[in-house]
Amino acid sequence: MTMDNVFITGATGGLGRRVIKYLVNNGSAVTALSRSEGNSKLIWDLGARPVMADLFSSEELTECTKGIGVIMHLATSIPRKAIPNKPSDWQMNDRIRIEGTKTLLKAARSNQIKYLIQPSITYVYGNRHGETVNSES
């Protein structure tokens, strides 16, 4: 897998900003999804090319991922509560992680993009009340 042309969602989050810096510093051309003019400026300042599009629009994502080799889906909406344990706390994050992923997969198929990278996120296991989480949890 080459990282020549990378498309990133979640570009202005804590992880996204660091990934963009790393990729740009290592010679990758990075295109990043933006939801606002302010975010677009931040993305430019990081060395990437911002594109305004809707994460939930197959048509828009298919258009802005033409010529891309790798998609990195880093977008999340982690609740800001100390212990987010109600399903409603996770509604937007679930939409981003489920519907957004499906939309990106459609765009990837349409543009013959072979790689979509999506990291895991905090709180996948919920509140374990002090119980240790491991690979068998």
List PLM regions with ranges:
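Phosphate-coordination loops involved in phosphoryl transfer and adenosine-cofactor binding
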Residues: 3-5, 68, 113
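N-terminal Rossmann NAD(P)H-binding glycine-rich loop of SDR-like oxidoreductase domains
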Residues: 5-26
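SDR active-site strand-loop-helix element
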Residues: 9, 33, 71-77, 116-122
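Glycine/Thr-rich phosphate-binding loops of Rossmann-like dinucleotide-binding domains
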Residues: 16, 81-82, 126-127
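Conserved glycine-rich Rossmann-like NAD(P)H-binding loop of the short-chain dehydrogenase/reductase
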Residues: 28-35
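NAD(P)H-binding glycine-rich loop region in Rossmannoid oxidoreductase-like domains
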Residues: 35-99, 107
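Conserved Rossmann-fold NAD(P)-dependent oxidoreductase catalytic core, especially the SDR/UDP-sugar
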Residues: 88-137
